[in-house]
């Protein structure tokens, strides 16, 4: 995790920053699943109520160079500004950037309980009220599942700052519950 690349989305009248970030994240997810082998992490340096307009890739120079040699940004080059692969500055802190999954939809929970044979439709309606739905204030990206075509949210949580890095593997989203990325 000694190098990084910043990718800044550039909204225009056709596409908002969040639409572009969603598309960027979806493309990155596909290429990381094929190529990165858990060696590339991400962060959002402008995170607040939203994830901001910048996605930062973290990895070794080799891992990031391999990623850059692919055409994974095809179709988004006109809407992004990509920095050079740079060395992480000295004296930085570290943090995890992880996915938070919510069991949020009461209707989905009812359907699942019925399809698994745990409950009948009437039992599910009685036992799983709408009040069980959880909401999150975390920032997110919205992407489309390639397996079933449904849209879903990937909620992203930036963990507390730490003084030392923690090694580990990153998912095909570039997120991890244990591995840290440099924060600056």
From Swiss-Prot:
Q: Which InterPro entries match?
A: CRISPR-assoc_prot_Csy4 (IPR013396), CRISPR-Cas6/Csy4_sf (IPR042564)
Question: How is this protein organized at the quaternary level?
Answer: Homodimer. Part of the probable Csy ribonucleoprotein complex with cys1, cys2, csy3, cas6f and crRNA.
Q: Which family does it belong to?
A: Belongs to the CRISPR-associated endoribonuclease Cas6 family. Cas6f/Csy4, subtype I-F/Ypest subfamily.
Please state, per the UniProt record, what induces or represses the expression of this protein: Expressed in late exponential phase (other phases not tested); part of a large cas-CRISPR3 polycistronic operon.
List all membrane-crossing ranges: none
Lineage, top ranks: Bacteria, Pseudomonadati, Pseudomonadota, Gammaproteobacteria, Enterobacterales
GO:BP terms for this protein?
defense response to virus; maintenance of CRISPR repeat elements
Give the recorded use of this protein.
If the spacer DNA has a perfect match in the chromosome then toxicity results. Suppression of the toxic effects occurs via mutations in the CRISPR/Cas machinery, or via target deletion, which might contribute to genome plasticity. This CRISPR/Cas system can be used to remove genomic islands, and possibly other genomic regions.
Name of protein: CRISPR-associated endonuclease Cas6f/Csy4
Q: What class of enzyme is it?
A: hydrolase
The record's GO molecular-function terms, alphabetically, read:
endonuclease activity; RNA binding
Has UniProt tagged this entry with the keyword RNA-binding? yes
Q: Which domain of life is it from?
A: Bacteria
Native source organism of the sequence: Pectobacterium atrosepticum (strain SCRI 1043 / ATCC BAA-672) (Erwinia carotovora subsp. atroseptica)
Knockout or disruption consequences:
Loss of crRNA processing, no chromosomal targeting.
The keyword Repressor belongs to this UniProt entry's keyword annotation: no
What does the UniProt keyword field contain? Antiviral defense, Endonuclease, Hydrolase, Nuclease, RNA-binding
The UniProt record lists the EC number as: 3.1.-.-
**Function in brief:** CRISPR (clustered regularly interspaced short palindromic repeat) is an adaptive immune system that provides protection against mobile genetic elements (viruses, transposable elements and conjugative plasmids). CRISPR clusters contain sequences complementary to antecedent mobile elements and target invading nucleic acids. CRISPR clusters are transcribed and processed into CRISPR RNA (crRNA). Processes pre-crRNA into individual crRNA units.
């Amino acid at each position: 995790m000694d190098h990084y690349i910043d990718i800044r989305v550039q909204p225009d009248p056709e596409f908002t920053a969040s639409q572009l970030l969603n598309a960027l994240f979806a493309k990155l997810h596909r290429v990381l699943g094929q190529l990165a082998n858990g060696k590339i992490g991400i962060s959002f340096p402008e995170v607040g109520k939203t994830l901001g307009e910048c996605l930062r890739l973290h990895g070794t120079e080799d891992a990031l160079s391999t990623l850059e040699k692919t055409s994974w940004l095809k179709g988004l080059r006109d809407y992004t500004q990509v920095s050079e692969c740079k060395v992480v500055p000295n004296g930085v802190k570290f943090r995890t950037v992880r996915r938070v999954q919510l069991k949020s939809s009461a209707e989905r929970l009812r359907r699942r309980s019925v399809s698994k044979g745990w409950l009948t439709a009437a039992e599910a309606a009685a036992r799983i009220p709408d009040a069980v739905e959880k909401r999150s204030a975390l920032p997110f990206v919205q992407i489309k599942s390639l397996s079933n075509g449904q849209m879903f949210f990937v909620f992203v949580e930036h963990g507390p700052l730490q003084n030392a890095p923690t090694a580990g593997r990153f998912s095909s989203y570039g997120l991890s519950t244990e591995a840290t990325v440099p924060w600056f």
